[in-house]
Amino acid sequence: MKKALYLLVVIVLSSCTNTDPNEQLQNLTGYWTIEKVEVENDSVVEYSLSQYIDYIEIKDSIGFRKKLQPKIDGGYIEASNDSEKITAKIEDDVLNLYYSTAFDEWQETVLVATEDELVIKNRDDKKYYYKKYEPLISTDEEETKE
């Protein structure tokens, strides 16, 4: 009985994460805000509110990541003119992102990518946890107040 219960728990938990790299790739494009960084297994840096968000756009496995600063009216200001080029590749049933700038090249692995959650592991084994960005004031709220 205990084995059956354990197996059921494992199946349920494993089905909760999105590990299909093709689905992960479809979920990458969007505005993401950092929640925390797992530096080591017992060391986590929490971000309650970040001044910047990441915008990721990928089409046909090619795209970019750009830092943006959200405005109160729902728009965005580019934090800089720089962006990181991204090439997405599915290798050994894992989604890898290859970044390049004028100064560096590196690779990160997507661990989870759903509509609302993104977890990426970098070359130093740090895990970055993102959630889908939601403006503090949405245009829907403003319309209902008027």
Where in this protein do the model-derived segments appear?
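Sec-dependent signal peptide recognition
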Residues: 2-8
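Ser/Thr- and Asn-enriched, surface-exposed coil loops between beta-strands
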Residues: 112-116
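C-terminal motif of bacterial Sec signal peptides marking the signal peptidase cleavage site
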Residues: 12-15
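N-terminal glycine/threonine-rich, aromatic-flanked beta-hairpin/loop signature
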Residues: 45-90
